[in-house]
């Protein structure tokens, strides 16, 4: 079983290799067929037949590539489930530790613990969903799209598996070029502007993270997490290190005044890109806090809690009011993501066990719910109407009853309604906030009111609002089997873990306790 972590990173690369290899092979076949009869009239007939064969082969290739990519992501999901089954949650040590590669005197180590395993599972669950979401809507450069998705899966998993902070930074930043290309190639009308926004914002923010990592390396002499976690930096040094790390993660979360890139990226990104962004990429900052701030810089994270809480509260209020005024459904969901990200940011900085565990649960729940909402908005509604303007939708409950039910359940999850994973995560996050700073906890709880307000307002205008919209005058049909499968899968995870959160909490408790108290 020592090669399971290798497999998580290698399987997507094998999928990319097969996509590229089969393309070259089929191209040679069609080229030979088209050139075989070019010297006679009979050959001309063969040539036209060869062209027809080429078209048929190309059409079959596209579906074949999609199947290869989908099977690849499913194989990775199976491997991650095997790792979860074999994982020992009674220890806080990294498990399945492997020396993946040796470069001169530098070794690359992989490992997984009770915190990272849930992010690995989230990644392997979301990636096949992101792949299927654009199964029919993307009709050009399909190979490039599939390769980007598989490459993103490898890079995201590498972030959660590496045991070296410098490698964490390298893979953390390596995600940007594929996202840049994904939005630039497959985005909407302002895709170039959006791709540059996401690249520049996150790259400039991460430069501060690099400076902090290099400072740690010069002071301690290593960048391995296990060694750094046993270090004790001076208080003044911790201040400067914290500023560098927090700025990078504040951009990635994102917090107030640093969220412009996320809104443009979500609105202009293809559906699969929005799902990856909301479901996984936004969780990189949450994971980074557990690796670089709480264990390495405990004094600052404890003493500056009120400042971080204030930033989170301002972000919640700003994002919520912005959500209430927007008319674009994808932009509304993006603002909602900013608000929920601020809540789990507050929870993990509460330095209370319940608050930290709640922040993780809310991050996981948000990954499921936001992905489902983006499928509803950018997949079901946009594919049928060609618009994202909320005022153009009304009365979908009359013509799309099954969709309206699924959409309503996801909206309940976004509100943090009981029996959903988001409710458990938000409740525990706010509990940790109240335990730490009751007054700021009171302001933080406004997120539950605001989220209910803008989510119900959105659903009411789309599902009801009088007679159905002109976009639905013809019989457009309810959700397809593919759309139902995607939405139902995400709903199952949201409700199952909402009813029985101990499935996650039991595995988290020992590692979170060790994180806080160094046991």
Curated annotation (Swiss-Prot):
The chain crosses the membrane at residues 2-22, 68-88, 112-132, 146-166, 167-187, 196-216, 239-259, 270-290, 304-324, 333-353, 360-380, 399-419, 437-457, 484-504. Its main location: mitochondrion. Signal peptide: none annotated. GO terms for molecular function: NADH dehydrogenase (ubiquinone) activity; ubiquinone binding. Its EC number is 7.1.1.2. GO terms for biological process: ATP synthesis coupled electron transport; electron transport coupled proton transport. Pfam families: Proton_antipo_M (PF00361). Keywords: Electron transport, Membrane, Mitochondrion, NAD, Respiratory chain, Translocase, Transmembrane, Transmembrane helix, Transport, Ubiquinone. One of its GO terms (cellular component) is mitochondrial membrane. The keyword Repressor does not apply. NCBIfam families: NDH_I_M. Core subunit of the mitochondrial membrane respiratory chain NADH dehydrogenase (Complex I) that is believed to belong to the minimal assembly required for catalysis. Complex I functions in the transfer of electrons from NADH to the respiratory chain. The immediate electron acceptor for the enzyme is believed to be ubiquinone. Belongs to the complex I subunit 4 family. This is NADH-ubiquinone oxidoreductase chain 4. It comes from Podospora anserina (strain S / ATCC MYA-4624 / DSM 980 / FGSC 10383).
């Amino acid at each position: 079983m020592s090669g399971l972590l290798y497999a998580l990173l290698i399987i997507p690369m094998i999928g990319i290799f097969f996509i590229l290899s089969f393309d070259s092979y089929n191209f040679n076949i069609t080229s030979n067929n088209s050139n075989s009869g070019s010297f006679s009239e009979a050959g001309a007939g063969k040539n036209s037949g060869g062209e027809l064969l080429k078209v048929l082969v190309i059409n079959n290739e596209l579906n074949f590539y999609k199947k290869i990519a989908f099977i690849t992501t499913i194989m990775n999901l199976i491997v991650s489930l095997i790792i979860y089954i074999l994982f020992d949650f009674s220890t806080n040590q990294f498990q399945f530790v492997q020396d993946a590669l040796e470069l001169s005197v530098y070794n690359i180590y992989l490992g997984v613990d009770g915190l990272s395993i849930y992010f690995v599972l989230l990644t392997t669950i979301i990636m096949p969903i992101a792949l299927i979401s654009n199964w029919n809507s993307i009709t050009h450069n399909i190979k490039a799209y599939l390769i980007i998705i598989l490459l993103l899966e490898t890079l995201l998993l590498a972030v959660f598996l590496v045991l070296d902070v410098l490698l964490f930074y390298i893979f953390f930043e390596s995600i940007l070029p594929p996202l840049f290309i994904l939005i630039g190639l497959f985005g909407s009308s302002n895709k170039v502007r959006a791709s540059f926004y996401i690249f520049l914002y996150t790259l400039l923010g991460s430069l501060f993270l690099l400076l902090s990592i290099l400072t740690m390396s010069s002071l301690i002499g290593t960048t391995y997490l296990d060694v750094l976690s046993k270090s004790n930096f001076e208080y003044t040094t911790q201040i400067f290190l914290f500023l560098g790390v927090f700025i990078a993660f504040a951009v990635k979360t994102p917090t107030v005044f640093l969220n412009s890139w996320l809104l443009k990226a979500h609105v202009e990104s293809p559906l699969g890109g929005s799902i990856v962004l909301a479901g996984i990429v936004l969780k990189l900052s949450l994971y980074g806090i557990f690796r670089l701030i709480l264990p390495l810089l405990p004094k600052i994270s404890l003493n500056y809690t009120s400042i971080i809480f204030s930033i989170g509260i301002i972000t919640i209020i700003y994002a919520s009011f912005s959500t209430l005024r927007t008319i674009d459904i994808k932009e509304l969901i993006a603002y909602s993501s900013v608000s929920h990200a601020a809540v789990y940011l507050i929870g993990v900085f509460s330095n209370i066990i319940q608050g930290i565990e709640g922040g993780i649960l809310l991050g996981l729940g948000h990954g499921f719910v936001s992905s489902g909402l983006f499928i509803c908005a950018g997949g079901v509604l946009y594919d049928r109407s060609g618009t994202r303007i909320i005022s153009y939708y009304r009365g979908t409950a009359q013509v799309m009853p099954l969709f309206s039910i699924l959409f309503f359940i996801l909206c309940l999850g976004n509100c943090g309604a009981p029996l959903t994973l988001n409710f458990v995560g938000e409740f525990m996050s706010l509990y940790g906030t109240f335990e730490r700073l009751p007054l700021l906890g009171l302001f933080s709880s406004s997120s539950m009111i605001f989220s209910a307000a803008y989510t119900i307002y959105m659903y009411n205008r789309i599902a009801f609002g009088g007679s159905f919209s002109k976009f639905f005058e013809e019989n457009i049909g309810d959700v397809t089997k593919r759309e139902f499968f995607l939405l139902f899968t995400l709903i199952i995870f949201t409700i199952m873990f909402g009813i029985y959160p101990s499935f996650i909490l039991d595995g988290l408790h020992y590692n979170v306790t060790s994180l806080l108290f160094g046991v």
